[in-house]
C-alpha cells in the first residue's frame, strides 16, 4: 500500500520520480493566467486568517459544500470566518476522489508545512491556529507567499476600463522582482446582447475620451485602451467565448447594429454574431501587430441557477459545461483572422472534454512558419483541472500535436495558495511520461525527457509569451 501524499505523491515509477525531483520540482512558476487581485499584491496584503486566504471567493469549495448540505450562510453568507472554515473542514473528508481533496492537502503542505495531518473537524482547531500564526509573519503576506513559491510572473485578468494603477505600483517597486502584468479581458465590450452593454459603452467612451456611436468609434476606443495596457507591460488577452459564433458584416451593417443597440433595441441572434465576429477579428489583428497572445476559453454554461444569480451574482459556483458545437464557427473565425496574416499566437481551452480532439486538431490548421507551437491547446480548464482532465488533455495534445512545445500549467485562480496546482500538474506530467517509459513507449533517455519536462514546466511559457523577467 502506498502512503497518502508523500514526497513521491503520484510518482509511481522510478523514472517519474527522477523526472520530477531532478527536473520539474524546482522549476520557477510562470502563471500566465490567474484572477489574483492586483491590489493585494500592490499593498502586500496581510491575510486576516485562513478563511481570508483560502475560502473567500473560492467557488470550487462552495460547490462542494453545497453538495454536502452546507447552508448558503456558511458558504457566501453572513456567518463568521471561523464558522465558514469549520463548515469546510467538515466537508473535506467527503471530497475524497475530488481534486479538492488533493489540492487542500497540497496547499496545507506548501506553504504552511503541514504534513501527515488531514483536515477534518477533529483537526480543524489545530490547523486553524497553526496557519493563522504563520499568516501573521512577513513570509506569508501576498508577496511573501509568491516569493516562497518561486513565482516569476503572474498575469492578472483586467477589464479595458481598468486604470491598472496597482500594476504600476508593483512595477515601480524595485524591492519586489516578480512580474505582475495585466491581461486584457474585453468581454464587456464584446457581449452586445447583455443588458449592461450600453452602460459599459458609456464608461469605455469616458476613459478613452471617445464618443462611441459608430463601429469605428468603438475600434478607436479599444485601440486607446490597448495602448494603455501595452504601456503597463500587457502581452496577453483573454476571452470568455461561452459560445463560438461567426457571421460577417459590412461596415454599414456594423454601424447600424451598434446604433440600434445603443438606442435600446434588441438585436437578432445573427446581428449579435456579426458584431462579435467583427470585434474578435479587429482585436485579433491588434494583438498580432503587438505580438500579444490571445486566449479563448470556450464552452461555459454560466449562471444556471437564476434564483441564486439574482441573490448572489455571477462567479459563485453555479456554472457548468455546455455542449454546443464549436468546430465550424471556430474554424471560420481563425481562418478570417489569418486571411491578412494577422492571426496572433493563440491558446484555445475547452470546458467540454468532448471537444479535446476538436481543439487538438484545430490548432494544427493554423500553426505559423518559424514559430514553435504558435497555436496551443490549453491545459485542462476549470472542471478539467484535475488528474484525469490533465492527463486527457496532455495525451490528446501529444497524439495530435507536439506535447514538447506545450506552454504548460496556469492556476486560473483567485487564491494565493493555488500555486501548488503547478506542483500537481508537474507530478501528473512526470507520472504520465514515466509510464510511457515503463511501457517501452518512450526511450529511457533522462536527458531528453528531463529537458522536455523543464520546458513544459517553465521555459516554453517564458519563450512563448516573450515577457522579460526580472
Curated annotation (Swiss-Prot):
Keyword tRNA processing applies: no
UniProt keyword terms in alphabetical order: Isomerase
EC top class, as a word: isomerase
Pfam families xrefs: UxaC
E.C. numbers: 5.3.1.12
Pathway recorded for this protein: Carbohydrate metabolism; pentose and glucuronate interconversion
GO-annotated biological processes: D-galacturonate catabolic process; D-glucuronate catabolic process
InterPro entries: Metal_Hydrolase, Uronate_isomerase
Reaction catalyzed: D-glucuronate = D-fructuronate; aldehydo-D-galacturonate = keto-D-tagaturonate
Entry-linked HAMAP family: UxaC
UniProt-recorded name of the protein: Uronate isomerase
Organism: Klebsiella pneumoniae (strain 342)
Taxonomic lineage: Bacteria, Pseudomonadati, Pseudomonadota, Gammaproteobacteria, Enterobacterales
Amino acid at each position: 500500500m502506498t502512503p497518502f501524499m508523500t514526497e513521491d505523491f503520484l510518482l509511481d515509477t522510478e523514472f517519474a520520480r527522477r523526472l520530477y525531483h531532478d527536473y520539474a520540482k524546482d522549476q520557477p512558476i510562470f502563471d500566465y493566467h490567474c484572477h489574483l487581485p492586483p491590489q493585494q499584491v500592490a499593498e502586500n496584503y496581510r491575510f486576516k486568517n485562513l478563511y481570508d486566504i483560502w475560502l473567500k471567493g473560492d467557488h470550487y469549495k462552495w460547490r462542494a459544500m453545497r453538495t454536502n448540505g452546507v447552508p448558503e450562510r456558511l458558504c457566501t453568507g453572513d456567518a463568521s470566518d471561523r464558522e465558514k472554515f469549520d463548515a469546510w473542514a467538515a466537508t473535506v473528508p467527503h471530497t475524497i476522489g475530488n481534486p479538492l481533496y488533493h489540492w487542500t492537502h497540497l496547499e496545507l503542505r506548501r506553504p504552511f508545512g503541514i504534513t501527515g495531518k488531514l483536515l477534518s473537524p477533529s483537526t480543524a482547531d489545530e490547523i486553524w491556529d497553526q496557519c493563522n500564526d504563520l499568516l501573521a509573519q512577513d513570509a506569508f503576506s501576498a508577496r511573501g507567499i509568491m516569493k516562497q513559491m518561486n513565482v516569476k510572473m503572474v498575469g492578472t485578468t483586467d477589464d479595458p476600463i481598468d486604470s491598472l494603477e496597482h500594476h504600476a505600483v508593483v512595477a515601480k517597486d524595485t524591492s519586489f522582482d516578480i512580474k505582475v502584468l495585466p491581461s486584457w479581458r474585453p468581454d464587456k465590450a464584446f457581449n452586445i446582447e447583455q443588458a449592461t452593454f450600453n452602460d459599459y459603452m458609456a464608461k469605455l467612451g469616458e476613459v478613452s475620451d471617445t464618443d462611441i456611436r459608430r463601429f469605428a468609434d468603438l475600434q478607436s476606443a479599444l485601440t486607446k485602451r490597448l495602448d494603455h495596457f501595452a504601456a503597463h507591460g500587457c502581452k496577453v488577452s483573454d476571452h470568455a467565448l461561452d459560445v463560438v459564433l461567426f457571421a460577417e458584416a459590412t461596415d454599414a451593417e456594423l454601424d447600424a447594429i451598434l446604433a440600434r443597440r445603443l438606442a435600446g433595441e434588441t438585436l437578432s441572434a445573427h446581428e449579435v454574431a456579426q458584431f462579435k465576429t467583427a470585434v474578435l477579428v479587429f482585436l485579433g489583428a491588434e494583438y498580432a501587430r503587438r505580438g500579444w497572445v490571445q486566449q479563448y476559453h470556450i464552452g461555459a454554461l454560466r449562471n444556471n441557477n437564476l434564483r441564486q444569480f439574482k441573490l448572489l451574482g455571477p462567479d459563485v459556483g453555479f456554472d457548468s459545461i455546455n455542449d454546443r458545437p464549436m468546430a465550424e464557427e471556430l474554424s471560420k473565425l481563425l481562418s478570417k483572422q489569418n486571411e491578412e496574416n494577422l492571426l496572433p499566437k493563440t491558446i484555445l481551452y475547452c470546458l467540454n472534454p468532448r471537444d479535446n480532439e476538436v481543439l487538438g486538431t484545430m490548432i494544427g490548421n493554423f500553426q505559423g512558419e518559424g514559430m514553435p507551437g504558435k497555436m496551443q491547446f490549453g491545459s485542462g480548464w476549470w472542471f478539467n483541472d484535475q488528474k484525469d482532465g490533465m492527463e486527457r488533455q496532455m495525451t490528446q495534445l501529444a497524439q495530435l500535436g507536439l506535447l514538447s512545445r506545450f506552454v504548460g500549467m496556469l492556476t486560473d485562480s483567485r487564491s494565493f495558495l493555488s500555486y501548488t496546482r503547478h506542483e500537481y500538474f508537474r507530478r501528473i506530467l512526470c507520472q504520465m511520461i514515466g509510464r510511457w517509459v515503463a511501457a517501452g513507449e518512450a526511450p529511457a533517455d533522462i536527458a531528453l525527457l528531463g529537458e522536455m519536462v523543464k520546458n513544459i514546466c517553465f521555459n516554453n511559457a517564458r519563450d512563448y509569451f516573450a515577457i522579460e523577467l526580472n
